[in-house]
Curated annotation (Swiss-Prot):
Protein name stated in the entry: Putative membrane protein insertion efficiency factor
Gene Ontology CC entries for this record: plasma membrane
InterPro entries (alphabetical): Membr_insert_effic_factor_YidD
Topology class, membrane: Peripheral membrane protein
């Protein structure tokens, strides 16, 4: 599923986006954000983050720098060694 989503983004970036004027209000662009979100968080959560981002990309939103959130590290939530 990850390869499918990334492939769709590649097709959009390669063949559709060049035909339209630049209009994304964010950095990174919504398609690059979605691609990175899928790489970092996997296809389901990454696609969801991309959909949420795209829904904010309109003239009434100020846009700006909006990076993909970091993946939470669950390894340190249940620390089992004891501190003295």
């Amino acid at each position: 599923m990850k390869k499918l989503f990334l492939g769709l983004i590649w097709v959009y970036q390669r063949f559709i986006s060049p035909l339209t004027p630049p209009s994304c209000r964010f950095y990174p662009t919504c398609s690059n954000y979605t691609k990175e979100a899928i790489e970092v968080h996997g296809p389901i959560k990454g696609a969801w983050l991309g959909i949420k981002r795209i829904s904010k990309c309109h003239p009434l939103h100020k846009g700006g720098f909006d990076p993909v959130p970091l993946k939470k590290d669950n390894n340190h939530q249940h620390c089992e060694h004891h501190h003295h």
